[in-house]
Curated annotation (Swiss-Prot):
Subcellular compartments: Cytoplasm
Pfam families membership: Cpn60_TCP1
Protein name listed in UniProt: Chaperonin GroEL 2
Annotated organism of origin: Frankia alni (strain DSM 45986 / CECT 9034 / ACN14a)
GO annotation, biological process: protein refolding
Recorded GO MF terms: ATP binding; ATP-dependent protein folding chaperone; isomerase activity; unfolded protein binding
């Protein structure tokens, strides 16, 4: 495919035009009085959102140079979302401000590499200052405040705070769509996985269609069980203890399943058989987790353990197991706390090393089931459009609240960045273009506050100058128009979100300024004339 090449100022201005189009679409959503953006979908209903990364992902520009500029800024939003789960709009606005000021200086003759170095030094110093300003999250109310600001709804913030309070730091909070109106919080007691009983004959509570076994033995097998002769020696040992038996294996079928069902129906022996969750290596890992949690061993020929020679000391124990047709919950497993802690540490290391979002998510779920708990927020609304918008807001707010618990909080409303820059730049010892790069950062750090004020109907420049003179932590409450102690009023941001937004914006801005040549694909004539394929159809008699 033929290429187009742009040099020098033309190259940078083409990229800037693309960046501005994307950033201007995103910036209107910032703050308590920010507006929403409607995104057209090829299939299904349009989406209404105020989430920066969702808007950025949907923007595709026609001009090749502008398209590349927009893609570079998309990367800022995506990276911030991956690291912190929120702050994507702030990151985009910071990137735009850094690039705009930077290009102005490059056009005036500044050395781009000197500017880039100055930007990097200044951002590192501001990040350190933000970390110093950060306060630990000490109360449930503070979690509720940060989640409420992200979601724009105090009821959602309160529910998220309750969920995180129940499941702890390592817990997982998921958001699901519900068929009913409003919000509902569902908490899981113990470890739950999404596989139920193999046969409905195992049910002990006919009304609830559940099999509930108290103080059972738990047999964990990494293979299918079909022959009753393999299972019989163990069944006899368990029956002598008068305890029920839970079997978690790849499958139980044939005469082995028939024997268990017949004994259950006759009342001779209470048991339930459950298929192991997951597939392949993930199934092995989850079975290992269950074994550690219950103090048992995975019976597998890989480690030289055979079903027919299994003894009671290789079985796991738990206070209670509840099995429905779709899921199994293990309550209070009898595993060794030190072994569980070791397994948790191992999973944490795997999360740190993993470069796949999907793998990280699955590992985080395993970690939560072992170390924390699982809370599900069920959200319902009158229409599908409202449901999707609400669900999206809640997911962002959950990420925001988790980030606050992780690294602490700073004053919200764009104030922390502005005030951190005042103290950070007092100690900077730079000269020439590097000093200019630091000044670019100082100017850019006022951009989020200016935009929040502007979206709320105030004069941005006036608000910025007023906040500069206020004590640290004091600033504009854009919802009411008052200048208050932001942390005391509950207007707070997680420092992780604020820091990630700045670092990612600076990373892309520095690269933007050093660009001298842009090479892009030349648009084909066919794409320009009829991208929807109508032209091709016309020649076929349609």
């Amino acid at each position: 495919m033929a290429k187009m090449i742009a040099f020098d100022e033309e190259a940078r201005r083409g990229l800037e035009r693309g960046m501005n189009q994307l950033a201007d679409a995103v910036r209107v959503t910032l703050g308590p009085k920010g507006r929403n953006v409607v995104l057209e979908k090829k299939w299904g209903v349009p989406t209404i959102t105020n989430d920066g990364v969702s808007i950025a992902k949907e923007i595709e520009l026609e001009d090749p140079y502008e398209k590349i500029g927009a893609e570079l800024v998309k990367e800022v939003a995506k990276k911030t979302n991956d690291v912190a789960g929120d702050g994507t709009t702030t990151a985009t606005i910071l990137a735009q401000a850094l690039v705009r000021e930077g290009l102005r200086n490059v056009a005036a003759g500044a050395n781009p590499l000197g500017l880039k170095k100055g930007i990097e030094v200044a951002v590192e110093r501001v990040s350190e200052e933000l970390s110093k300003q950060a306060k630990e999250v000490e109360t449930k109310e503070q979690i509720a405040s940060t989640a409420s600001i992200s979601a724009g709804d105090s009821a959602i913030g309160g529910l998220i705070a309750e969920a995180l309070d129940k499941v702890g730091k390592e817990g997982v909070v998921t958001v699901e769509e519900s068929n009913t109106f409003g919000l509902e919080l569902e908490l899981t007691e113990g470890m739950r996985f999404d596989k139920g009983y193999i046969s409905p004959y195992f049910v002990t509570d006919a009304d609830r269609q559940e099999a509930v076994l108290d103080d059972p033995y738990i047999l964990i097998v990494n293979s299918k069980i079909a022959a009753v002769k393999d299972l019989l020696p163990l069944l006899e040992k368990v029956m002598q203890t008068s305890k029920p038996l839970v079997i978690i294996s790849e499958d139980v079928e044939g005469e082995a399943l028939a024997t268990l069902v017949v004994n259950k129906i006759r009342g001779t022996f209470k048991s339930v058989a459950v298929k192991a969750p997951g597939f392949g290596d993930r199934r092995k890992a989850i079975l290992g987790d269950i074994a550690i949690l219950t103090g048992g061993q995975v019976i597998s020929e890989d480690v030289g353990l055979k079903l027919e020679s299994t003894s009671l000391d290789l079985l796991g124990r738990a206070r209670k197991i509840v099995v429905t047709k779709d899921e199994t919950t293990v309550v209070e497993g009898s595993g060794d706390p030190d072994q569980i802690a070791g397994r948790v540490s191992q999973i944490r290391n795997e999360i740190d090393k993993s470069d796949s979002d999907y793998d990280r998510e699955k590992l985080q779920e395993r970690l939560a089931k072992l170390a924390g708990g699982v809370a599900v927020i069920k959200v319902g609304a009158a229409t599908e459009v409202e449901l999707k918008e609400k669900k999206h807001r809640i997911e962002d707010a959950v990420s925001n609240a988790k980030a606050a618990v992780e690294e602490g909080i700073v004053a919200g409303g764009g104030v922390a960045l502005l005030q951190a820059s005042i103290t950070a730049f007092e100690k900077l010892d730079l000269s020439g273009d590097e000093a200019t790069g630091a000044r670019i950062v100082a100017l850019a750090l006022a951009a989020p506050l200016r935009q929040i004020a502007s979206n709320a109907g105030f004069e941005g420049g006036v608000v910025v100058e007023k906040v500069r003179d206020l004590p640290v932590g004091h600033g504009l409450n854009a919802a009411t128009g008052e200048y208050v102690d932001l942390i005391a009023t509950g207007i707070i941001d997680p420092v992780k979100v604020t820091r990630s937004a700045l670092q990612n914006a600076a990373s892309i801005a520095g690269l933007f300024l050093t660009v001298e040549v842009v090479v892009a694909d030349r648009p084909s004539a066919g794409a320009a004339e009829g991208g929807d394929g109508a032209g091709a159809m016309a020649g076929m008699g349609f």
